[in-house]
Amino acid sequence: MLVSSSVLKDDSSLRIFKESPNEFEYIIKRHDMDDRKEDTESKERRSTMGSSFIRFGRGQSFFNNLDNSAFDNEIDSKVSRHPRWKSPDIVIRFGRSGMKSTNDEQPKRGKNDLNFIRFGRNIQIVPTDFDLSAVCSALMSNDAISDAGLHPDVTRLFRLCNNLNKITGEISLDSLETNSNHRE
C-alpha cells in the first residue's frame, strides 16, 4: 500500500510519507507546511530514532495559564504554537526493528521478536518462512517419539504431519500411530 517515498492522499490536507531507511516510521505532513523550516531544537523535542513510543501534546506547559512570573522563566520560549489546523509534522514510529546483523552475516532476530503474532485470544499466525516439512522430519528423527506421555500439542503436530504425508507422500508417520495405539 505504501511504497518508499510514496504519498497517500485523501480529501483532507494531510500527506503520509513512508520513510525509506526505517520500515517502522511514517510522517504525516500538511500541504501548506512543506516550506516551513525546522530548527534543531524542535527536532530534538521529537522522540529519538530508537524510541518505541509516540509523544502527543503541543509542548505547552499547564503553567502558561498561571499569572505567576516565576514560572515564565521555566517555559521554553522557542516552542512553536501553531493553530490546530496548522500543526507541525507528526512522526509516528511503530516499535523497533528486531533484525540485527553482524558484519556480513545474515540478519538475526532480536531476543524480543515473536515467532507467533497473536491477534485476539488463542489465534496464532505462523510466520511466512515457516517450513513445516522440516519440522515434521525433525520430529520424526527425534528420539522423543518413543517416550511415553507426549504433550498433546506434539501429538496434534504428529497428526498434522501424518495428514500432510497422505497428501504429499514425503513424510511417514504410520509407525507413530501404531506405537500410540499400543500405549492406549
Swiss-Prot record:
Summary of the tissues where the protein is detected: Expressed throughout the central nervous system.
Record's keyword annotation contains Secreted: yes
Record-listed Phenylalanine amide modification sites: 56, 94, 119
Keyword line: Amidation, Cleavage on pair of basic residues, Neuropeptide, Secreted
Disulfides per UniProt: none
Domain of life: Eukaryota
One biological process term in Gene Ontology: neuropeptide signaling pathway
Subcellular location: Secreted
GO cellular component: extracellular region
Main location, first listed in the record: secreted
Bilayer-crossing regions: none
Residue ranges the record assigns to the propeptide: 1-44, 59-83, 97-107, 122-184
Record's function text: In insects, FMRFamide and related peptides have modulatory actions at skeletal neuromuscular junctions, and peptides that are immunologically related to FMRFamide are released into the circulation from neurohemal organs.
Family, similarity comment: Belongs to the FARP (FMRFamide related peptide) family.
Protein name: FMRFamide-related peptides
Source organism (scientific name): Camponotus floridanus (Florida carpenter ant)
